[in-house]
Amino acid sequence: WKPKSIKDSGNAGWHRDSQYWPFWGNDGLFTAWIALSNVSTSSGPVRFIPGSNHWKDIDGLDFFNKDLISQEKILKDNYGNIKIVDALLSAGQVSIHSSHTYHSSGANLDETPRVGMVVHFCTDRAIRQRVTGSNSTYLDQLKDASISPFIFGGDP
């Protein structure tokens, strides 16, 4: 859900999903972004940097930082001229990216909301890691099929 934005209020900063998932190893995690409405260049599409899933982590990038210009400067300082691709989708289409792909989205300038949903999924290559602190309960929730269902047979 991304309603019409005022300036940068609807921005999602450049980030990798993996930076928010300390309870998983570095492989086999993906995000599916499902468009429930048409997504145009003016509705704040998800934007990707192809190949960035092979980059090292970059300090200073954060989903919650709405200043995309300063974050794009950080990206260019680290990797030079970068290519950014918008995920322009019709309702019902899906965009899938690795948890290590840098992505963001800008403001929705349309009169109607941009509507979508996200599904995070993992392959058999994803390895759970025990963490401490506030994230420590997530692994227990992953064993609960009512919260984190498995779509294939076998033991989680």
Language-model segments: what does each one mean?
Residues 1-47:
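Conserved double-stranded beta-helix
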Residues 3, 49-56, 114, 120-126:
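Short edge-strand/loop segments of extracellular domains
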Residues 6, 19, 26, 35, ...:
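Short capping/connector residues at structural and topological boundaries
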Residues 12-16, 66-81, 111-113, 131-139:
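Short, surface-exposed loop/helix-turn segments at secondary-structure junctions
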Residues 27-31, 43, 84-86, 114-118:
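Extracellular structured ligand-interaction cores
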Residues 39-106:
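Double-stranded beta-helix
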Residues 61, 94-96, 100-156:
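Non-heme Fe(II)/2-oxoglutarate
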